[in-house]
């Protein structure tokens, strides 16, 4: 079976369009990582940039530094996990063979 080089180039163009669409979708992802029953919430975009950190005021004074650091770290890690899951769900059908 002969492979037509023009078909290959056409497919490469479609692949590039798919990649561009995926990049656009990823840039629009926004997730919230949470810790301590929403005492700490980290908002992160699809490029893993933290956009916001919210700490419930009524708990802020009651937490020691170590507990607060732990909750921020947990919320951040939760957000990273959620971004990765969103990226995976948006890209698995768009990239051939699940690459």
Curated annotation (Swiss-Prot):
The UniProt record lists the keyword Cytoplasm: yes
Pfam families named among the record's database cross-references: YbaB_DNA_bd
Keyword Transmembrane helix: no
Transmembrane spans: none
Keyword tags: Cytoplasm, DNA-binding
Residues making up the signal peptide according to the UniProt record: none
Subcellular location: Cytoplasm, Nucleoid
Alphabetical list of InterPro entries matching this protein: YbaB-like_sf, YbaB/EbfC
Molecular function (Gene Ontology), one example: DNA binding
Lineage top rank: taxon: Bacteria
Cellular component per GO, a single term: bacterial nucleoid
Subunit structure: Homodimer.
Function: Binds to DNA and alters its conformation. May be involved in regulation of gene expression, nucleoid organization and DNA protection.
Family: Belongs to the YbaB/EbfC family.
Protein name (Swiss-Prot/TrEMBL): Nucleoid-associated protein EbfC
Organism, scientific name: Borrelia duttonii (strain Ly)
The organism's taxonomic lineage, starting at the top: Bacteria, Pseudomonadati, Spirochaetota, Spirochaetia, Spirochaetales
Name of the gene encoding the protein in the UniProt record: ebfC
